[in-house]
Amino acid sequence: MLAKRIIPCLDVTAGRVVKGTNFVGLRDAGDPIEIARRYNEQGADEVTFLDITASSDQRDIILHIIEACAEQVFIPLTVGGGVRKVEDVRRLLNAGADKVSMNTAAVQNPDLIFDASSKVGSQCIVVAIDAKQVAPGQWHVFTHGGRNDTGMDAIEWAKKIDALGAGEILLTSMDRDGTKNGFDLALTRAVSDAVKIPVIASGGVGNLQHLADGVTEGRADAVLAASIFHFGEYTVRQAKEYMASRGIEVRL
């Protein structure tokens, strides 16, 4: 069995790391490079940067942050936000990203997933799904930073992402985002069971038990969290030790 990954997520806007609840009400959490360096030292498996205003405000990609970060942080770096074409993917990879995450543009043009995967390799392509429950056992895909309901079924979209050649799915529950109530385990399990590629669970981590639940009950391959790490409640090392104590294989 592959070791399960713990991935701190940095939501970046205007060059600062922020954290909100249900995609609004943002609170400043610090300098992105400094924070990423701290996670590198704590033993994070990867770090994810999401430029959360890039798609909605048509802002260009945070290349300068990525370049500086890649010089100082030596774990895989995933970057998303404002990715609209294959050229954007290339620019991010050239700046030092290891993987590129796309969301809104992939929904608007699913061929982008296939084109990007074909040109740079599927291992570099992550497709993010922002999902919100609309009925029991049913979730819709939202775009533009969680502002636009596409009406698309999240499970069906996940299957299509898999078929188009993406390397993994970053699955965020908008209902749980920032609430500290734990992952939406039903959503996580439904998507994990529907696809062959790895699924990263995101949205709602409030304690270490939630991280373990994402793997054991949600069947996720990796778990992503922000505020529990940013504001010093837990270190990545503590999270890994807890998961190992629950019998989950992690890289210590």
From Swiss-Prot:
Q: Which reaction(s) does the protein catalyse, per the Swiss-Prot or TrEMBL entry?
A: 5-[(5-phospho-1-deoxy-D-ribulos-1-ylimino)methylamino]-1-(5-phospho-beta-D-ribosyl)imidazole-4-carboxamide + L-glutamine = D-erythro-1-(imidazol-4-yl)glycerol 3-phosphate + 5-amino-1-(5-phospho-beta-D-ribosyl)imidazole-4-carboxamide + L-glutamate + H(+)
Query: What are the protein's UniProt keywords?
Result: Amino-acid biosynthesis, Cytoplasm, Histidine biosynthesis, Lyase
Which family is it part of?
A: Belongs to the HisA/HisF family.
The uppermost taxa in this organism's lineage are: Bacteria, Pseudomonadati, Pseudomonadota, Betaproteobacteria, Rhodocyclales
Q: Which Pfam family is an annotated match for this chain, by its short name? A: His_biosynth
Q: Which residues form the signal peptide?
A: none
Task: Kindly report the protein's main subcellular placement as a broad class.
Answer: cytoplasm
Write out the annotated subcellular location: Cytoplasm
Identify the InterPro entries for this entry: Aldolase_TIM, His_biosynth, HisF, IGPS_HisA/HisF, RibuloseP-bd_barrel
Q: In which pathway does it act?
A: Amino-acid biosynthesis; L-histidine biosynthesis; L-histidine from 5-phospho-alpha-D-ribose 1-diphosphate: step 5/9
The entry's protein name is Imidazole glycerol phosphate synthase subunit HisF
One cellular component term (GO) for this entry is: cytoplasm
Query: What the protein does?
Result: IGPS catalyzes the conversion of PRFAR and glutamine to IGP, AICAR and glutamate. The HisF subunit catalyzes the cyclization activity that produces IGP and AICAR from PRFAR using the ammonia provided by the HisH subunit.
**Which GO BP terms sit in this record?**
L-histidine biosynthetic process
Under the heading CDD domains, the entry gives: HisF
